Amino acid sequence: GKTTLVKQFSKEFDYFISLNLEKEDADLFRKFDNVGAIWQYLCLKNHIVQDKNKSVLLFIDEIQEEPIAVAMLRYFYEDLPYVFVIAAGSRLQSLTKKHLSFPVGRVEYITLRPFSFLEYINAKHGEQWATLLRETSVPEVLHNEMLAEFNTFALIGGMPEAVTEYLNTNDIERLSPIFNSLLKGYNEDAEKFAKNIE
């Protein structure tokens, strides 16, 4: 989902740095007390020559795991305006329990959701079908085919990896490992979230 999307987007930049704050990367925000020092360290570690003419994307994943990183977002914006930062997390709502908020006026929010049926139709059949579905009632001649598509979509669900695999293979049986991985991820997130509630 979000990580795949960010990696695709990173191809638009000269440099890409990815941090995961569920791992040892969180220590970085405890070791250094300002974004300048963090940035210098990241450039050295990633063999990046600091050049304001080169575009850089910094991806901070699971930012809710390190409240200091959330607070520092403001300073990335103010002190390093040439560094583009994407912060993401699967449980950002946990920040409100810690009485932390993202810097006002310096953060844009984007919510990722699973594919809708309309997006699925657009991906599978193109904009013409999506426009037909959006703007008119489905002609009788396409009704059964559209109903079959809806039934397939209901079986696949809207998670991007599952939709992509199905569109590439047209084989629902190949989705089983993807569903198992998603289920495992949901279970792990539920356990982490439950620990935060306690």
Predicted feature locations:
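Hydrophobic positions on the alpha1 helix immediately C-terminal to the Walker A/P-loop
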Residues: 5, 9
